[in-house]
Amino acid sequence: MAVGKNKRLSKGKKGLKKRTQDPFSRKDEYSVKAPSTFAVRDVGKTLVNRTTGLKNANDSLKGRIFEVSLADLQNDEDHAFRKVKLRVDEVQGKNCLTNFHGLDFTSDKLRSLVRKWQTLIEANVTVKTTDDYLLRLFAIAFTKRRPNQIKKTTYARSSQIRAIRKKITEIIQREASTRTLAQLTKLIPEVIGREIDKSTHGIYPLQNVHIRKVKLLKSPKFDLGALLALHGESSTDDKGQKVEREFKEQVLESV
């Protein structure tokens, strides 16, 4: 047996083990607030590195996009398949004020809608709201059987598909171009779909008519006052107003 040093045993510590710092100790927690158009305002919490030197925490938060289920925002499980995107536009204190950034369907809902023996009709429309938001709305609809129909299939002719698509485009243009973004977000989930269904019934009966996606293409110049109004707040100094209302000047009747 060869006599020698066991390298593994004789190996000593070259240096002390580095002390690892918890990365969360350098972070702050901010609350994410949804616009007042939704029933539930508290979306959740988000983490960001504290302001150090030239790196401002507010700059890191602005522009963040959160995807939230519409069921959580409206306290209604019927909207569970809709996902709303909210973008942080302003940070006030520990609150992140968000604005609507888009809407989408869950993939499982979309897959469940597509079936055999029916025609899928899709349309997309680019519209501008009254407050200068440029949006692209994607509509989806499916044909259904007429009352007392014996035939298994419900295929629409090309001329009927074109007529339905034209009707969808007209309705979306009319509803979106005369409203603000906040008003439009209330209509998108159900109202526009029902309006399309009712208007196209004479061409071909439809089912599962939805605005499946909303894409924000362009936003107007940032306006803090408009964002605060959307969140039910005011950019004016409330303290000054309260003092004016409470204070009553005493008028002396006699000197």
Curated annotation (Swiss-Prot):
PROSITE patterns assigned: RIBOSOMAL_S3AE
Pfam families: Ribosomal_S3Ae (PF01015)
Chief place where the protein resides: cytoplasm
GO biological process: translation
InterPro entries in the cross-refs: Ribosomal_eS1, Ribosomal_eS1_CS, Ribosomal_eS1_euk
Residues modified to N-acetylalanine: 2
Composition-biased stretches (Basic residues): 1-18
Keyword Ribosomal protein in annotation: yes
GO MF annotations, alphabetized: structural constituent of ribosome
Bridged cysteine pairs (disulfide): none
Location(s) in or outside the cell: Cytoplasm
Region (Disordered): 1-28
Official protein name in the record: Small ribosomal subunit protein eS1
Organism: Ajellomyces capsulatus (strain H143)
Designated gene of the protein: RPS1
